Amino acid sequence: MPKVPVYNIEGQQIGEIELNDSIFNVPINTHVLHQAVVAHLANRRQGTFAAKTRAEVRGGGRKPWRQKGTGRARQGSIRAPTWRKGGVVFAKKPRDFSIDLPKKVRRLALKCALSSKVKENNLIVLDKWDMNQYRTKEVIRVLKNLGLENEKALIVIPEKNEYLQKSTKNIPEVKTLQVGNLNVFDILKYDKFIILQDAVKKVEEVYA
């Protein structure tokens, strides 16, 4: 089992924690990670765009001028794609872009992402982080104590903490997630992975 240091919010190491091998020490499968990221980005798409073809644009049923004798190029409709206010060629229509990955693949991808953070020494465990007021400066102070003030960091908490979650929203490249919202895309997007000790236990309960 991999062992990682446990820090307090002052940046001092106060102990070590053993991580579950089946979650934090699995072989990295880049193909599965790629599938998970593609699915995540596809599922974020609304797919509500729509444009009209020449058949759907109002008007254009009459031939604008006779076929021959005017000296002008022949035209059949004022709603042809070459005309202003004409229809769109191969117009886009609303569609569902969502990709439903099998549960086993989703879980494996998450384990691979977490394992990659351990292997890269980018996983930081905090013993606790209690906030009872909205203080962005406090979040910046803690990140500075951990030597992460200029890093892209993902903070994972065991349950909702509105003060911490909203305080990090003002900091570019820092995001806070609950364990239930953990996803491969965010784990890979942020360089540093900060997780509270209680959140580690919760992850191991769910995915072990």
Curated annotation (Swiss-Prot):
One of its GO terms (cellular component) is ribosome. Residues 58-77 are annotated as: Disordered. InterPro entries: Ribosomal_uL4, Ribosomal_uL4-like, Ribosomal_uL4_dom_sf. One of its GO terms (biological process) is translation. GO terms for molecular function: rRNA binding; structural constituent of ribosome. It comes from the Bacteria. Keywords: Ribonucleoprotein, Ribosomal protein, RNA-binding, rRNA-binding. Residues 60-71 have a biased composition (Basic residues). Belongs to the universal ribosomal protein uL4 family. Part of the 50S ribosomal subunit. One of the primary rRNA binding proteins, this protein initially binds near the 5'-end of the 23S rRNA. It is important during the early stages of 50S assembly. It makes multiple contacts with different domains of the 23S rRNA in the assembled 50S subunit and ribosome. Forms part of the polypeptide exit tunnel. PANTHER family: 50S RIBOSOMAL PROTEIN L4, LARGE RIBOSOMAL SUBUNIT PROTEIN UL4M. This is Large ribosomal subunit protein uL4. It comes from Caldicellulosiruptor saccharolyticus (strain ATCC 43494 / DSM 8903 / Tp8T 6331).
